[in-house]
C-alpha cells in the first residue's frame, strides 16, 4: 500500500503488542498482526486447548488437544512469521503483571480482567484494543483514554458488569463472529 511504504513498514517492525487471551479472539488477532509485520508480540493465557475450542479457534487443530494455547500459538507464529519476536506467559494475567506492549489487546472473556486491562492502559497511557463475542454478536473498540485528554475508556462505555452478562463458555459463540471481531 502506498500509504505504508518503507517508513510504515519500519513502524510496524518497531511496534510491540501485548495480547491477553489466545483463544478465539487473541489467536487470530496475533496471526494477523504477525502477518502484517509487527515486530514483537507478547501473549498471555493460562488455558489449554479443548475439543470444544476447535470450531472457533482456527489456530489450533486436533493434534493440539491438551496442550497450552500460548505454546501452540507461539510455535505457529514463529514458523509462519520468523521476523516477529514472540514472547509468551503461560499464566492468567493480573494487574500486578507488567505488560511489555505499547498497545494492549483485550481478548478476554470476563469483565474483571477487562476492567483491569482498561485501568492498566489508562494509567500507562497506552491504547487498549478490546474485543468480545458471545452467541451471534460481537464488538470491537479502541480506547485511547490514557493517550488523549477527554477520550473515553472501556469503563466509561461499560461502567459495571451487565446483569445478564454471560461468558461464551456458558452461552456459546459462533466461530465466524469471533473471526470478524478478532480481525
Regions found by a protein language model. Name each.
Residues 1-183:
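Adenine nucleotide-associated cytosolic modules
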Amino acid at each position: 500500500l502506498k500509504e505504508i511504504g518503507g517508513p510504515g513498514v519500519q513502524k510496524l517492525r518497531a511496534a510491540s503488542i501485548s495480547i491477553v487471551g489466545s483463544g478465539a479472539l487473541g489467536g487470530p488477532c496475533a496471526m494477523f498482526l504477525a502477518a502484517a509485520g509487527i515486530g514483537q508480540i507478547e501473549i498471555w493465557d493460562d488455558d489449554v486447548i479443548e475439543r470444544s475450542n476447535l470450531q472457533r479457534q482456527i489456530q489450533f487443530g486436533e493434534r493440539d488437544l491438551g496442550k497450552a494455547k500460548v505454546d501452540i500459538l507461539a510455535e505457529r507464529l514463529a514458523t509462519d512469521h520468523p521476523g516477529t519476536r514472540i514472547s509468551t506467559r503461560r499464566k492468567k494475567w493480573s494487574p500486578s503483571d507488567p505488560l511489555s506492549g505499547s498497545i494492549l489487546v483485550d481478548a478476554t472473556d470476563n469483565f474483571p480482567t477487562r476492567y483491569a486491562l482498561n485501568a492498566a492502559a489508562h494509567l500507562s497511557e497506552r491504547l487498549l484494543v478490546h474485543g468480545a463475542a458471545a452467541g451471534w454478536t460481537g464488538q470491537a473498540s479502541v480506547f485511547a483514554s490514557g493517550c488523549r485528554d477527554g477520550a473515553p475508556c472501556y469503563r466509561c462505555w461499560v461502567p459495571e458488569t451487565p446483569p445478564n452478562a454471560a461468558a461464551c463458555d456458558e452461552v456459546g459463540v459462533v466461530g465466524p463472529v469471533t473471526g470478524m471481531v478478532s480481525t
